[in-house]
Amino acid sequence: MHARQGMTRRGFLRGAACGIAAGLMPWGTARAETAPTRLALTHGNGRAANVYDALKLIEPQVREGLARKKTVVIKPNMVSVNQQLAATHAECIEGILEFLSPLVKDDILIAESPANGPAHEGYDNYDYRRLAKPYRVRFVDLDAEPFQTEYLVNERHHVRPVRFSSLVLDPDVYLISAAVMKTHDRAVVTLGLKNIAAGALLKDGGFRWGAGSRGKTDKHLIHGGPENQGIHYNMFMLARRAPPHLTVLDGFEGMEHNGPTEGTPVDHRVAVAGTDWLAVDRVGAELMGFDYRKIGYLSFAADAGLGETDLDRIEVLGERIADHVRAYRPHDTIERQYLWM
């Protein structure tokens, strides 16, 4: 019974993704006419410096994107408000702000909806508040902001309404995903896209993990069922709705084994940045030693032409990928996570 359900789920997910891909992807010679995708990879002994240097390498692409938007929003990853290894470090945000300072004249919003508690606790615990002195920033709790209704699937492929941040979906926003390179217990890895797709799903203001919590959260609905039957399809669909315009992966200290909250540190000292979210996440997975084709949502997005995944067509500025690949230990449930294939 379990195997038959798995086959049905795989058929549904692959069929749906390929059907969408047929409508999105300009298959054929049009692909060959595009210029290679550029992204940056840096390595060094300073987290903020790594991020800043990576962004400087792709400054023309970032400037081009900023010129078309009114507001800049940095979305950190705070799956936990009280565990630094699981969250975007303030020094990563500092590197981004230092780069943006001469390019953006208005306040830059730092906006988050942590999984296990209120945003203000994360901002306090991780010392984000100090960034308000040298930079023009404003801190936003996405759970207190307007939302729009999006739809995800559950394990029976029925749609479920969810609250999704209106700020993240705002067409006038230049959205930056500032993520940590981590393994994951359901989606293999956490990188730039997952930070947006899961992080912009909202919860009630009083919600916390654990017994006695007040309110509800919509974040778990991205899993698509108790065995994560729809997680990759849901991530893929949200990638079409809210792709980041700029992705920054902070791998100065990554997380391996039982991420995204119970893993152990990896002294990697890298940063990746680019305006093609799929190319950045694909390179991030490569640096962590994972085959992106085994990561469902990245595979679906590649089939749909949502970005570049061919390393021969990705121009990496700065360091060479091959020089910095580390074999991150995967989550204990990794084989079960690969059952979508």
Where are the predicted features?
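N-terminal and secondary-structure boundary signal
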Residues: H2-M341
